[in-house]
Structure formats: structure tokens, C-alpha cells
Design a protein with these regions (language model features):
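SH3/SH3-like beta-barrel superfamily modules
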Residues: 201-231
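Conserved small/polar residues in nucleotide/adenosyl-binding loops
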Residues: 485-492
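Boundary/entry segment of secreted carbohydrate-active catalytic domains
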Residues: 230-232, 236-277
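Short beta-alpha junctions and helix-cap segments that line functional grooves
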Residues: 275-276, 411-415, 452
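Primary recognition of N-terminal secretory signal peptides and signal-anchoring hydrophobic helices
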Residues: 3-212, 242-255
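Chitinase-like catalytic core of GlcNAc-active glycosidases
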Residues: 257-267, 295-444
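Active-site region of glycoside hydrolase catalytic domains
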Residues: 426, 450-476
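Conserved, compact domain cores that house catalytic/ligand-binding motifs in diverse enzymes
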Residues: 198-205, 210, 262-311
Length: 496
């Protein structure tokens, strides 16, 4: 019996050993898997790839804790940034004239200009040395020295190496800030298996961009944006960002100490000016007349003029101011886009406007430029208003600008900046429906109300003048076409 048992034991022993070894291997594999599962990876992310830097003269741009698609250029150890980036992300008041290679910046009182590749810039009539080239023209834009941008903008920036990156702050909001409790890592994504972007140490300061259950999205002071374990951070605190080195500009306006009751007076010939006494006598309460006297007449910036000094004298004798209207649509052969996108012709136009204001002793200038598109000359039109405003204010002349009600197609108007410079913004509260549109009201109450409320979001109430129509349209609908009859207000009753 024992001999038989011994024989069986000998046969079973190898099997038991093999089974034991298999179990041991499985246990080891399980332990290894558990260790691998819960052991953070030490793999690091290539920061050059992370910041998408492709050459040694590039630097990443991190703006308000967001990585920009734009890159800075390092030229002779100086930082340059693309004009489009400056305009869209830092300060929209910079204006690049690609036709004449000049960079302009308009303050409340001065026009500051710098020519491409020049070390100097002029402030009105004074020339200043910047020390190195301020702006360099490129094939489709321009590169501007970031130090020069900072000189006129509410921004701060710091540069870092390995890899080269610039961290810019341009929004001065409240942020969630915290400090690191213990040394840890910032990773590409939330999870210990995600590659490491940066090692952080105890007491390092970070900004919390988004809080999670276990991982928070954060930004380090040197511009690395990633994820960190929530428990590795102190309790977050609200912190209001400030820029003590920047002093906000003060804009002054020539505003009247009374409500404005303005009438646009359509004048189509020199002889029509003699009718102003009848026009005024048939109205009540008007304190500003704006005759349609001037329009852009050629591509050099010159004006056509049907104004009258007698008209102005009569209005003044009645206690009425005269704000001459200047338009861009009377002469269809003129390319207004060309005039406004070239600094030299834009300057000629402004000088012509001021010359007319002096010659006819105008109290104000009313700009009625229409059919403006962003692609053609949107930015150039805003720059035109800025530059004209400085000339007007230096000579005690009011500037008003006629604008359509806010809509998706005219967001580029930047009414808030326009209101910084112009004294009054005149809402064209009419032509809700027009020739070529569906039939409808010229100026319905809901449409006008929405236009005023939208404008108030950008323009102070005491700078708004609401232009209302004293005309209507009687629409005729036929199977093949839509037409209308244009009627003045006093003619409407007989057609109802």
C-alpha cells in the first residue's frame, strides 16, 4: 500500500509543482498589473511638440491661460507678434496700413505712427526713438515689437525658455488661484498614465481653470496648461488680477447741455439752401440742422460741396447749430474703400472735412458713410473716425456718426470704441425693410426698441441720438413682384 502511495506521490509531485508555479506566475502577473495600474507613468511630454514650436526663432503665445494658434517671432533677441494677433487678442486700436507700410495707434489726443523697419515713431509732431525696429512688414501682415504693444496696452507679459514661450495677461478678471501642497506633476490629461508636462514643487502658485472630482485643469505661472491631482492643491481662493503699471485713458467729449433734436435736411443743389427759413418755420423744437452738403468725390479724398454760409448764418440767428453731413454714396464712381485704406488719402479726406468746417463755421460734423463691409474697409472706417475725432475736438467741433442698428453683419463697427472718440452715435432707426427686401415696416417699435437696447450695451445713453423716419412705404404685392410707393409722413393719411 505504501509502495503504491509512494508511486502516486512521485507521479503527482511534478504536476503539483507545475500547478504551483502557474499559480505563482499568475499571482506575480496580477501583482505586476496592479502595480502598473496604480503606478504613475514617468513618461514626459515633449514641450516643443506640446507648444507646436517648429523652429528656433518661434515662441509659443499663451494668452489669459489659453494657448494661441499664433506664434511670436524672435528677431535679434526681440519679441515680435503678428498684427492680426495684436488686433484680435490684445488691442484692437492698433491699425496697420498694408498699402503704405505704416503702423498707427490713436490715443484720446494723439495719432502715433511708425513706418516699417524704422526705430522711431512720431506722436503728432514729436519724433521718439524706440531703440530697434518697431514693425516689420510681411507678405500678408506685419510683425510688431511686443514691447511697443505693451507701451499702449493694458497687458503684461513674461518670457520663458526651454521651449521659448511668452505668457501674456490682457484680461483683468477674477481668477481661482491655489498653491501646491506637495511636489507633484502637471500632466497632459487627468490621470496618472498621462504624460508629464511639468514637475511642480510645494508652494508653487497655479491658476485653477476647471475643477474636477480628482483632477483639476490648471495653468502654471510659466504657461503650462494641464491637469493636476485635486488633493495636491490648497483650497482655491478668488484673486482679482490687476495691472498697476497701466493708467486707463480718459476720453472727453463735446456734448451739449440739452437734448439734441436734430433734423437731416436733404439738400440736393446749391439753390435749395435758400429754402431753410421755410423748412425751419414748419417745424418745432429743432436745435440742430444737418444738411446733406458734402460727399466723397474722388479717390484722392477730395469732397464735393454744395454748402452755404447764408444757410449757416440763418440757422445761427435762430439759435440752431449746423452739423454738416458728409457721405460716401453720392458719387458711385468713387472707391471709398481705397480712400480709407490708404493713410495718405484718408488724411486728405479728414483735412478736407476740417477745411469745410472752418470755411462754413460749422458747429459739428455728421458722418454718414454707408454700405461698409468688414472685408472691404471695416477697420479703416473705425480708424477714420478716431483720427477725425482728434481733429474735431482740437478745434471745438462736435462729431456725430450715423450707424445702423446692431446686427450680425456689422459687429465690426466696434461701437464702444467709436463712442470713445465720437461725441454722438446716431442710430439709423429706419429701413427695417427696404427696396429688395420682403414687404414690411420701415421702423417697427419692437425692431427699434431692440436696436436701442443693443446699442446701449456699447454706447452711453447720453451719447445716443435716435434717428426716426418721417416717411413710410405703401407696399404692393403681385404674383410676380413686390413694389412700393415712398410717402412722406404728411402724405400717409390720405393713403390709409
Amino acid at each position: 500500500m505504501s509502495e503504491r502511495f509512494s508511486l502516486m506521490k512521485k507521479k503527482l509531485l511534478p504536476a503539483l509543482i507545475v500547478t504551483g508555479l502557474i499559480i505563482l506566475v499568475v499571482i506575480i502577473m496580477g501583482i505586476t498589473a496592479l502595480i502598473n495600474k496604480y503606478t504613475p507613468t514617468k513618461k514626459t511630454e515633449d514641450l516643443k511638440e506640446y507648444f507646436n514650436i517648429s523652429s528656433d526663432d518661434e515662441a509659443a503665445l499663451i494668452v489669459n491661460n489659453e494657448l494661441s494658434d499664433y506664434k511670436a517671432k524672435i528677431i535679434d533677441k526681440k519679441i515680435y507678434v503678428d498684427y492680426k494677433f495684436v488686433h484680435d487678442s490684445l488691442n484692437s486700436r492698433f491699425y496697420w496700413d498694408a498699402n503704405e507700410n505704416v503702423l498707427l495707434y490713436t490715443t484720446a489726443s494723439d495719432i502715433i505712427s511708425a513706418a516699417a523697419d524704422s526705430n522711431s515713431y512720431s506722436v503728432t509732431k514729436q519724433t521718439n526713438d524706440f531703440g530697434y525696429p518697431i514693425v516689420k512688414a510681411t507678405s500678408d501682415s506685419a510683425l510688431i515689437a511686443l514691447d511697443y504693444v505693451k507701451q499702449y496696452s493694458n497687458i503684461t507679459f513674461k518670457s520663458y525658455d526651454d521651449p521659448a514661450r511668452i505668457v501674456i495677461t490682457s484680461k483683468w478678471d477674477e481668477i481661482d488661484s491655489a498653491t501646491v501642497n506637495k511636489s507633484t506633476q502637471v500632466r497632459v490629461k487627468g490621470g496618472i498614465k498621462s504624460p508629464i508636462l511639468k514637475e511642480v514643487k510645494k508652494d508653487d502658485k497655479i491658476t485653477i481653470l476647471d475643477s474636477g472630482d480628482k483632477w483639476d485643469k490648471v495653468a502654471t505661472e510659466d504657461g503650462v496648461i494641464g491637469y493636476i491631482k485635486s488633493k495636491a492643491l490648497s483650497e482655491s481662493k478668488k484673486n482679482k488680477l490687476t495691472n498697476p503699471d497701466y493708467e486707463e485713458e480718459t476720453f472727453t467729449h463735446i456734448k451739449k447741455d440739452k437734448d439734441i433734436c436734430l433734423a437731416w435736411n436733404q439738400v440736393t443743389s446749391q439753390s435749395a439752401n435758400s429754402k431753410v427759413p421755410q423748412v425751419i418755420s414748419s417745424t418745432k423744437g429743432i436745435n440742430v440742422m444737418s444738411p446733406t452738403w458734402f460727399y466723397l468725390n474722388d479717390n484722392n479724398g477730395n469732397l464735393a460741396d454744395i454748402a452755404s454760409k447764408d444757410y449757416v448764418s440763418y440757422c445761427h440767428s435762430q439759435g440752431i447749430e449746423v452739423w454738416g453731413l458728409f457721405s460716401n454714396f453720392e458719387n458711385t464712381d468713387v472707391d471709398a474703400a481705397y480712400v480709407l485704406t490708404h493713410t495718405s488719402t484718408r488724411t486728405t479726406l479728414i483735412n478736407q472735412i476740417m477745411s469745410a468746417a472752418f470755411n462754413y463755421e460749422l458747429d459739428g460734423v455728421n458722418i454718414d458713410f454707408e454700405n461698409i463691409t468688414e472685408a472691404a474697409y471695416g477697420d479703416s472706417y473705425i480708424e477714420f473716425i478716431r483720427e477725425l475725432a482728434i481733429k474735431c475736438h482740437n478745434n471745438g467741433i462736435s462729431l456725430s456718426v450715423d450707424v445702423t442698428v446692431p446686427a450680425s453683419f456689422n459687429k465690426f463697427f466696434n461701437r464702444s470704441d467709436m463712442a470713445n472718440f465720437a461725441d454722438y452715435i446716431v442710430i439709423m432707426g429706419y429701413d427695417e425693410h427696404y427696396k429688395g427686401s420682403d414687404a414690411g415696416s420701415v421702423s417697427s417699435i419692437p425692431w427699434v426698441t431692440e436696436g436701442v437696447e443693443s446699442t446701449l450695451k456699447e454706447v452711453p445713453a447720453d451719447q445716443i441720438i435716435l434717428g426716426m423716419p418721417f416717411y413710410t412705404r405703401i407696399w404692393e404685392l403681385t404674383p410676380k413682384a413686390v413694389s412700393y410707393t415712398h410717402l412722406r409722413a404728411h402724405e400717409t393719411r390720405s393713403n390709409l
